[in-house]
Amino acid sequence: MILVDSSVWIDYFRGSATKQTQRLDLLLDTEALAIGDLILTEILQGFVIDREFDEARRLFASLKLVALGGEDVAIEAARNFRKLRKLGITVRQTIDTVIATRCMVSGYELLHDDRDFDSFEKHLGLR
């Protein structure tokens, strides 16, 4: 299962051709994809035009919806944040710590274009 971060979805809906959006285009037809509940909120709230909002909702309805949080993930996310901080790395957004931790706990790969996740890949085993 591959969870797709908002950093990729935003570029995708803007029509930006990046390595990640090109991969997403291929994966939409061939792989089981997931979206986190808070990522869904973040993406949908950005649409101004109702038609585009509805089109995005239909696309997201075909994906697995993953609850990102919960007590176990929250505690493990705090541990992961602290591990990185001890290495001199500060993650800019708490939500990124939660997303990365959910992926690691659930064995998901994360498709992203956000440097905050690079430290999770390098030091904590995020795929």
Residue ranges of model-derived segments:
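Histidine- and aromatic-rich ligand-binding microenvironments
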Residues: D5, G36, R92-Q93, D114
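A generic structural signal for short hydrophobic patches within well-formed alpha-helices
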Residues: W9-I10, L40-I43, F117
